[in-house]
Amino acid sequence: VFRYDSLGQDFKGNISLPLKVSAAHRFIALNKNTYLFFCEARKGNKMVVYDIDQKKIISEMYNLPRFLFFKTFYHHTYSPFYIYENKVHFVQSYNGDVFTFENNSLVPKYHWDFGKQNFDISGLKDESYEYYNKYARTVGAKYANTFISYVENSRYYIARFAYDNKFWTLMYDKQSKKHVVFN
């Protein structure tokens, strides 16, 4: 992994990943020496916490099947990470659940209950991309899923997701503890 300044102009150095981490698709710095890598193609745990000075994996988590990332729409389009109030946050793309990353583990922060429209991946099987292209427009369209963008500030958490073959917006008011969904 090549590191550059925030403008992407000045090369700062590189990070050599261990063989157990063949590719890092997304990453975020936890501090000067520690990175959280999201590795979609990796077997088993997709998140790896790596200490670049010690050149070792500190922890790993988030075991999901690889086909979700390569044959379905139920994965991240952009980074699954964002920073708010100096904490790294992770958004689970298939159902929109939000976690903070603390003490090398994921801690639940927001869970969205859409009732009968909650999306559950436990019944999904390793099928072709074509199968999931049709599935997303038929069976999958009956559920709130594919959370593609998200932002948080001191007052609101806002996310865009798919439901009923349309994109919808979820707006959660953190002060009133109420939410609204619209398209």
Where are these regions (language model features)?
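Beta-strand initiation motifs
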Residues: Q9-G13, K55-I58, S105-P108, K177-V181
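Structural motif
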Residues: V1-R3, R42-V49, N95-F101, Y163-M171
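Loop-centered beta-sheet repeat module
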Residues: V48-L106
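Repeated scaffold domains used in trafficking and secretory/extracellular systems
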Residues: K20-L30, F69-P80, I121, A144-S149
